[in-house]
Amino acid sequence: MAKTALITGASSGLGAEYARQLAARGAHLVLVARDRAALDDHAARLRRTYGIEVEVLVADLLKPRQLAKVVARVADPERPVEMLVNNAGFGLPLAFERNDIEDEVEHLRLHVEVPMRLTHAALGAMLGRGHGRIVNIASVAAFIPRSTYGACKGWLVGFSRWANGRYAPSGVTVTAVCPGYTHTSFHERIGLPPGQEGVPDALWLNARDVVSESLRDVSRGRPVSIPSLRYKALVALARFAPPALASRLGERGR
């Protein structure tokens, strides 16, 4: 088990669940998010419940100086991070042509540039120690045409596959986790209340199962983790589906 895990987007959703499950396994934590109150509350509960050390690092990862602070923490040789979970992200509410282009650029930076910078910092430290794990939270949208969101997640999957092949022999594994629709506050933040996402009930997953299954794949050093059999089947179908059908699949929900 990782001695210390750093998790971005750790105040809610999958990030908060990764923190809970890693704490239950004995990992100390560095929690990164913008909301200090939510981070402090979550950290206090984790310390109280699991008796672990929790460091809170408040940062807006789209602000260069604040991102640099997190990069420095990841690379700090005196306080080694054994697992990096690149989880921070957000969705956009409209079709590409209707979104503000500056919102699209920030979306691209948070989903691609930020994990690339943090991964680069982590690799320098982890390779020097000869061990470490990097977890990039992608999505099944990586395998289905899905505007810029799917394109960003596709980059994460391709990058993680390559990085795992290159660095796993040196003791550092890189895994892209590709959940399907998961019950978190993600959709509400883009204006889709529960029940209005346009997604059949059978396709919804819960965060606890997504994180548990993905951590099992991470521990095995797999380059890609697709939690749940139903989404493994959906991804397999998408690989062989005609382009028109794959595009229609990508129009469901967010």
Language-model region placement:
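C-terminal helical subdomain
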Residues: 176, 197-234
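Substrate-binding pocket helix/loop in short-chain dehydrogenase/reductase
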Residues: 95-97, 103-108
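Residue(s) in the substrate-gating loop at a strand-loop-helix junction
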Residues: 139
